[in-house]
């Protein structure tokens, strides 16, 4: 069996159906004796150019090891599913199991956001304490 990387783009209005689609396509692969190495749901992303007057799409990545008949069935499913806007099936030399660069970037951004928000909360607390100290000093000076 050969290794494949499969990326498909789903119409943004059909994003709620993506988990079911992933399950359906995974079943096609596993029932034919294939193996799934990685599934990544990239979510809604901006398109580089409009496709059918749409500027966003929901992206999904699969890395699989499957026989040719399973890949042919997937291609047929993609072709007849109106929710799938585009798809790409690429043959790979080996199984890819590590996270894709897109997921790594998302994780890094999430960490940066968490660090900056926690830092800003500390700054807000410090400013709040300083304001209270000033008001307390002003009140004690008046009395």
From Swiss-Prot:
Entry keyword set: Ribonucleoprotein, Ribosomal protein, RNA-binding, rRNA-binding
Segments of this protein annotated with the region Disordered: 100-143
CDD domains, per the entry: bS6
GO biological process: translation
Stated family: Belongs to the bacterial ribosomal protein bS6 family.
Its biological purpose: Binds together with bS18 to 16S ribosomal RNA.
Protein name: Small ribosomal subunit protein bS6
Taxonomic lineage: Bacteria, Pseudomonadati, Pseudomonadota, Gammaproteobacteria, Enterobacterales
